[in-house]
From Swiss-Prot:
Application in biotechnology: May be used in light-driven, bio-based production of hydrocarbons. The oleaginous yeast Yarrowia lipolytica expressing FAP from Chlorella variabilis under blue light conditions produces odd-numbered alkanes and alkenes, which could be used as drop-in biofuel.
Protein name: Fatty acid photodecarboxylase, chloroplastic
Transit peptide location: 1-62
Residue spans crossing the bilayer: none
Gene (name only): FAP
Entry annotated with the keyword Transit peptide: yes
Annotated organism of origin: Chlorella variabilis
Cofactor binding notes: Binds 1 FAD per subunit.
UniProt keywords, alphabetically: Chloroplast, FAD, Flavoprotein, Lyase, Plastid, Transit peptide
Annotated signal peptide: none
Length: 654
């Protein structure tokens, strides 16, 4: 244990990389990348197809000039002279869905503005490479304010910063939550019966369906994990049964209880990450009415109040950072700006646009357009802690890390072959695709999610463990064999906020996740009981056979007070931030948008992303965001109306 502990105390640092994202414009199938000077663009499409033969050089050059003329009306702005029916702020999960659905009507012009780069990294495609994505140039690298209740710690909050957003950087887990989650929203038109068909429409499930709960014709690929650790996964399942859990064959089937142990389905396609860029946006980039700009940071929504009412006219953005020229993208008559920047940056940008609590806006000299107290409030995330244990010496080499890497930190040839030839093996896994949902105190819905990892954390902060793993690999060090159980308060009671630090839209947001601030202490109790539950599982006959003591919390952490202190000092985000532009019924003063996702007090402005979720569903939030975007697209195109419910299944359990 001494060598393990010494490694666990080593400080990890993420690999250094160029953080300046290159600007990319995608329009009518053309891929345009910046060359020198910075404002001029040259097409890369021909370069991708191979070198142009010398005899065709002049015609290729003429074609390039024509491509540029089609995209640029002047030398400074890729959108000058254009008007759009829909401007999507952000190119993440929801925006990819909307861009696909809205641009299907060739008469509508759609613009997507993404602050980050294109989605071309190999690390995004390979699920196991998630260790390289946190705190990387593909992440916003956001940290909270010091949290007094968490031993004055800052919390790192991962958010994807590229086309596809967090669907390109998350753990790929596919969770809808339970039917009761949506019924608890209490918003007209968004009950479990209303939303189920939109989950099904989005999905092509390789292992379930088609049926009442799963689809076979949607863009989003979902499948069972293609890596199994036969010894450790089997031992965990047996151990969970020993402590009283029953198996759950499908956590997304609402006809039975959400609790139990089992396999978490993943958003993958034959073992490759199936992020929403690849599933929704990339296949339609050839549409001539769809334009996508990367490296385009929106700074505010342009809103006109001259006619006595607030009307969105377009957005202001920069393709050259805080010192760059502020450019404008304009709406066509009747067009709409749709905020898809996520639960952190959507409220952040709304406030910079004058939409938010008037006192805060006035503090920073921002003119108030719509005084909405709820903007940036109601932040909900699922806080987590973990237990970790090494395996006995005779089982060294049993972990997922051993199946991928050799003792020098090099990827095993067998792992590469399994991945490339069959889409199987350790490289297809983010490590946490088995687990459980548990009621710790008889709640109607499980309050605890357990992610079982057949690999050992060397940091009590689960996200820092991923970062540390990448450091170990780069230094050619062997990662010790063991297991981890990440314990998540999946239906938290605590809430936090997103605020401003200045009037500068390039300054980082003021983040406070608010973990463990609920007045009844329910979230802390859930995590404390989760630690006890995980220890019971580790002591079971099925799992104790493999384990050699406990690394975290450690043998010295015994009493509830000691466990609570451990939780406060190690609690971390499970990266499921929602709720900061809450959807609500008429008369709900805390809401920011109505049940059609329209921002109160501003015409031509909607929010379609995780911000609108009134109460976070149990489980990861990628699938619910896709559902919301699918439904929003249908509302915008007139293919659906609020109040028309999907056919209910025969039985819908809470």
């Amino acid at each position: 244990m001494a060598s393990i502990t010494s490694r666990a105390s080593a400080r990890a640092s993420c690999s250094q990389a160029n953080t300046r994202a290159g600007r990319v414009a995608l329009s009518g199938g053309a891929l345009l990348r910046p060359a020198r000077p910075a404002r001029s663009f040259v097409p890369a499409r021909k370069q991708q197809q191979g070198a142009v033969r010398r005899g065709g050089a002049l015609s290729a050059r003429a074609s390039a000039v024509e491509d540029i003329r089609k995209v640029l009306s002047d030398s400074s702005s890729p959108v000058a002279g254009q008007k759009y029916d829909y401007i999507l702020v952000g190119g993440g999960t929801a925006a990819c869905v909307l861009a696909n659905r809205l641009s299907a009507d060739g008469s509508k012009r759609v613009l997507v503005l993404e602050a980050g780069p294109d989605n071309t990294s190999r690390d995004v495609k390979i699920p196991a490479a998630i260790t390289r994505l946190f705190r990387s140039p593909l992440d916003w690298n956001l940290f909270s304010e010091l949290q007094e209740q968490l031993a004055e710690r800052q919390i790192y909050m991962a958010r994807g910063r590229l086309l596809g957003g967090s669907s390109a950087t998350n753990a790929t887990l596919y969770h809808r939550g339970a039917a009761g989650d949506y019924d608890a929203w209490g918003v007209e038109g968004w009950s479990s019966e209303d939303v189920l068909s939109w989950f099904v429409q989005a999905e092509t499930n390789a292992d379930f369906g088609p049926g009442a709960y799963h689809g076979s014709g949607g863009p989003m690929r979902v499948e069972n994990p293609r890596y199994t650790n036969k010894q450790l996964h089997t031992a965990f399942f047996k151990a969970a049964e020993e402590v009283g859990l029953t198996p759950n064959s499908d956590f997304n089937d609402w006809s039975h209880d959400h609790a139990g142990y089992g396999t978490f389905q993943v958003m993958q396609d034959k073992g490759t990450r199936a992020d929403m860029y690849r599933q929704y946006l990339k296949p339609v980039l050839g549409r001539r009415n769809l334009q996508v700009l990367t490296g385009a940071a929106v700074t505010k929504v342009n809103i006109d109040q001259a006619a006595g009412k607030a009307q969105a006219l377009g957005v202001e953005f920069s393709t050259d950072g805080p010192t760059g020229e502020r450019l404008s993208a304009e709406l066509a008559p009747g067009g709409e700006v749709i905020m898809c920047a996520g639960a952190v940056h959507t409220p952040f940008l709304l406030k910079h646009s004058g939409v938010g609590p008037s006192a805060e806006l006035k503090e920073f000299g921002i003119p108030v357009v719509s005084n909405l107290a709820g903007v940036g409030q109601n932040l909900q995330d699922q806080p987590a802690c973990l237990t970790a244990a090494p395996v006995k010496e005779k089982y060294d080499g049993i972990a997922i890390s051993d199946h991928i890497y050799n003792e020098k930190g090099q990827i095993r040839k067998r792992a590469i072959a399994s991945y490339l030839l069959g889409g199987r093996g350790g490289l297809t896994s983010t490590g946490c695709d088995r687990g459980a949902f548990v009621r710790t105190a008889g709640q109607a819905l499980p309050d605890l999610q357990v992610r079982f990892v057949p690999g050992m954390a060397l940091d009590p902060d689960g996200v820092s463990t991923y970062v540390r793993f990448a450091k170990f690999q780069s230094q050619g060090l062997k990662w010790p064999s063991g297991i981890t159980m990440q314990l998540i308060a999946c239906r938290p009671q605590s809430t936090g906020s997103v605020g401003l630090k200045s009037a500068d839209p390039f300054a980082p947001p003021k983040l406070s996740p608010g973990y463990l601030t609920d007045k009844d202490g329910a979230d802390l109790a859930t995590l404390r009981k989760g630690i006890h539950w995980a220890r019971d599982v580790a002591r079971s006959s099925a799992l104790s056979e493999y384990l050699d003591g406990e690394l975290f919390p450690g043998s010295g952490v015994v009493s509830d007070d000691q466990i609570d202190e451990y939780i406060r000092r190690s609690i971390h985000s499970s990266n499921a931030i929602t709720g900061t532009c809450k959807m609500g019924n008429a008369g709900d003063s805390s809401s920011v948008v109505d049940n059609q996702l329209r921002v109160h007090g501003v015409e031509g402005l909607r929010v379609v992303d995780a911000s609108v979720v009134p109460k976070i569903p149990g489980g990861q939030t990628g699938a619910p965001v896709v559902m919301i975007a699918e439904r929003a697209a249908a509302l915008l195109t007139g293919k659906a109306t609020i109040g028309a419910s999907a056919a209910a299944p025969a039985t819908v359990a809470a």
